[in-house]
């Protein structure tokens, strides 16, 4: 019998949960749109205050006064691991599924607000700035959040079905939890690489760009 590769397992997983992946992706992009809408709903004074602090930050960045890469990496991996770990735990809790929806939506809002504000205030320069400050880490981080969110929801639904059929969670196969834990490890590895990008790549790109803008 041919051994099933990890690629085949992943493709089968996506096929089996395609509707969930679509739902989670739509929820995330709704958050992105909502984040951009929040930018447009801000008053002029609010935008000016926020842009002032942002300009101060970019000014320090262009002067090479940003925090050390090691500190940024530590803060980034801690934040991402905490957020993803909470999603994972909520998937086991069954009743935490609505909170997973909210967390995915909020992640979209953060991305949408960040990009929307930079573009709104700085035009084309803001677009390129968001490109170098947001894109590198989020190339891996956004898929990690979407996969973790989908797996957490799918696992929670599986436990709910088990609860209604068996009237107990004690009969749930231990393999479920093993696979679910493996998913978390893979996602945390993606988050680790993403944090490396955020700490060591994005600041370099931002420093080069801000030195031309500020």
Curated annotation (Swiss-Prot):
Changing residue 107 to R: Partially restores the sporulation efficiency of SpoIIP G-108 mutant. One of its GO terms (biological process) is positive regulation of cell septum assembly. Keywords: Cell membrane, Membrane, Sporulation, Transmembrane, Transmembrane helix. The keyword Repeat does not apply. InterPro entries: SpoIIM, SpoIIM-like. NCBIfam families: spo_II_M. This is Stage II sporulation protein M. The lineage of its organism: Bacteria, Bacillati, Bacillota, Bacilli, Bacillales. The gene is spoIIM. The keyword Protein biosynthesis does not apply. It is found in: Cell membrane. Pfam families: SpoIIM. Changing residue 76 to R: Partially restores the sporulation efficiency of SpoIIP G-108 mutant.
């Amino acid at each position: 019998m041919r051994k099933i590769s990890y690629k085949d397992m992943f493709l089968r997983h996506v096929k089996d949960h395609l509707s969930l992946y679509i739902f989670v992706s739509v929820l995330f992009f709704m958050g992105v749109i909502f984040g951009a809408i929040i930018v447009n709903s801000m008053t002029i004074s609010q935008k000016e205050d926020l842009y002032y602090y942002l300009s101060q930050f970019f000014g320090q960045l262009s002067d090479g006064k940003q925090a050390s890469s090691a500190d940024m990496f530590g803060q980034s991996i801690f934040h991402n691991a905490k957020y993803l770990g909470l999603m994972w735990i909520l998937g086991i809790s069954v009743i935490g599924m609505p909170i997973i929806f909210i967390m995915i939506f909020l992640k979209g809002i953060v991305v949408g607000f960040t990009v929307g504000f930079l573009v709104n205030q700085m035009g084309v320069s803001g677009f390129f700035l968001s490109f170098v400050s947001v894109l590198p880490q989020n190339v891996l981080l956004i898929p990690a959040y979407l996969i973790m969110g989908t797996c957490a929801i799918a696992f929670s639904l599986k436990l709910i079905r088990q609860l209604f059929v068996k009237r107990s969670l004690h009969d749930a196969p231990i393999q479920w939890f093993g696979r679910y834990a493996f998913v978390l490890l893979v996602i945390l590895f993606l988050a680790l690489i993403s944090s490396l990008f955020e700490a060591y790549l994005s600041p370099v790109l931002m420093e080069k760009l801000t030195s031309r803008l500020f």
